Amino acid sequence: MSDIAITICILALVAVIGLWIGHWKIRGVGLGIGGVLFGGIIVAHFMNQNGLKLDAHTLHFIQEFGLILFVYTIGIQVGPGFFASLLSAGLKLNGLATLIVVLGAVSVFVLYKVVNVDLDIILGIYSGAVTNTPSLGAGQQILTELGIENANSTMGMAYAMAYPFGICGILLSMWLIRLFFKIKVEEEEKQFQKASGQDKESLTTVNVKVTNPNLSGLRLIDIPGFDNKDVVCSRLKRQENISVPSADTIIAIDDVLHLVGEINALKKMKLVIGEEIDMPMTHLAGDLRSERIVVTNEKVLGKRIKHLGIHKKYGVVISRLNRAGVELVPTANTALQFGDVLHIVGRSDTIGNATSIIGNAQQKLQQVQMLPVFIGIGLGVLLGSIPFYIPGFPVALKLGLAGGPLVVALILARIGSVGKLYWFMPPSANLALREIGIVLFLAVVGLKSGGGFVDTLVHGQGLEWMGYGMFITFIPLMITGIIARLYMKLNYLSLCGLLAGSMTDPPALAFANAIKEDSGIAALSYATVYPLSMFLRIMSPQLLAILLWTAM
């Protein structure tokens, strides 16, 4: 067999063993995809005993390409909600997640100075302690730039030592916070539901009867509140007739307006217009119907809603827009992206015409445009290779193969499309590429570090490294958890999701979800902090490496 064939067979063996190990669970918690790392260590141990070696250049390429695939698809997945999470109600949660990352970096700095651990070892321990594989790849790249030899193998070994408690430490933190504050989960869920009912930001509807005589004869757009674009009027009932109003529709007393918007905005509109009435207009007889359609027509990508002309031509109004799971109030200036889900209302005989303009071709949602994928990867690698010179630093700072593709993917996913190119990727395709990438990366890391793993654990400093990893995992989580609960009064279920998301750890999310099944509270906060946390986890080892290198 050729060297390439042998290498591929070994990688396949590592993946099979590792994924099998990852499926082992103790009380519902397992290593997950991290099992591939230990599969690589096991195979490498026996390869080392039998004197079998693989081509280093081939392994290096596979490792880097796997990392690029993983971080790029992560960026495409979380990009649409990344910038929104920084500006919306997730600001507090993202601030706490940032605190966890900063405290972790401080812990690394303290350990490096106090116990005099080698730079490659402490960065490997850090990546394992926070259970973040792209962090490992970013650290390995910057250490190679600094000229540290054997950084790949030693960092991988240290990562493997710290990884198991990295998972267990998150779960232990959740349990101790619950014990310390004597938290009752049922009450936490009720409090969250009550608070979310008062401050809910998702869209809702209300029917308001016009009783304010000052509004009679005004155009719809001239009513105070509609100019803020926070509320949409999707239907108007006048006597027994239901129609789709336009901005120029003249309002009369006793008209019933079907409004869509956030609760606080709707409350203000009711004060201006009149009284709320219990009249489900969606069930009234008439020639109107509503549909949910998906933007798939390449010709409308990037176009503003006002330029579609579907209201003037067909009397159709867009009442809601769902983008990457986030509901938005559409305005005339909202630009459409591939995969946007629109809730439209119009006459039965014309709504089909509007649908054909927007697309709604379900088969396109299952197709992957490969050209944008490779454009994005290429741009990401180029960005990651650009040096940033900072006075006083011994080497130029780079985003690297972990940071560059991630940043580009976040930006492209936020843009959505350029001309006929769109960066939407079906969830199944995204997951497949992401899993292939991380399996390849972890398999090679395990193979590179596994030769001396057992010897380091039994006869070397393996147990010490585990202890350092526990410190880096546990201290930031507990400090932030106590601050969030004691001073910021954060809901416990949201706090559990925050802890799991700040460590970008799916097994911890599974544990948090199991605390109160079917609530979805932990998953919501996890998704809120995950994008920023992933970005910070990739950048932090590079900054730590340069700062600690200059302090040597």
UniProtKB/Swiss-Prot annotation:
The chain crosses the membrane at residues 4-24, 28-48, 67-87, 95-115, 157-177, 370-390, 402-424, 438-458, 463-483, 495-515, 529-549. The keyword Transport applies. Pfam families: Asp-Al_Ex, TrkA_C. The keyword Membrane applies. Signal peptide: none annotated. HAMAP family: YidE. This is Putative transport protein HS_1470. It comes from Histophilus somni (strain 129Pt).
